[in-house]
């Protein structure tokens, strides 16, 4: 196999790895979006009822009552907490969801472009493989 052909096979492998990484990134974005939406829903429901589920860990929760549901405490860094108005946090989270949706579109576009390159490269490789096969067939001695 000549060097150019090997390089094309390596490029095909790299493209496939890129698509896998981009799909993984999409999955992470989806999880972040879902977490933000759940948080928004929880904050919205606190406006109706102060009752919340307090996570204890390992999937265990206890029912509790929020003392001040109008204020949300956010972790904004290592050991740094910030208190904000619940409506402000909801708007911030909705903005984050929108930004993540836009990022998701960009990632999907990149996946499509990479897949197009994969299709183009595979087609090229198939043509070259067919040409090599034909050349090899012509070089074989004919037997009667």
UniProtKB/Swiss-Prot annotation:
InterPro entries per UniProt: PFD_alpha_archaea, Prefoldin, Prefoldin_subunit_alpha
Main location: cytoplasm
CDD domains named in the record: Prefoldin_alpha_GimC
Keyword line: Chaperone, Cytoplasm
Keyword Chaperone tagged: yes
Compartments it resides in: Cytoplasm
Top-rank taxon: Archaea
Gene Ontology cellular component annotations, sorted alphabetically: cytoplasm; prefoldin complex
GO molecular function annotations of the record: unfolded protein binding
The UniProt record lists the keyword Cytoplasm: yes
Biological process terms in GO annotation: protein folding
Positions of disulphide bridges: none
TM stretches of this protein: none
Function: Molecular chaperone capable of stabilizing a range of proteins. Seems to fulfill an ATP-independent, HSP70-like function in archaeal de novo protein folding.
Oligomeric and partner information: Heterohexamer of two alpha and four beta subunits.
Similarity comment text for this entry: Belongs to the prefoldin alpha subunit family.
Protein name, UniProt field: Prefoldin subunit alpha
Native organism: Methanococcus maripaludis (strain C7 / ATCC BAA-1331)
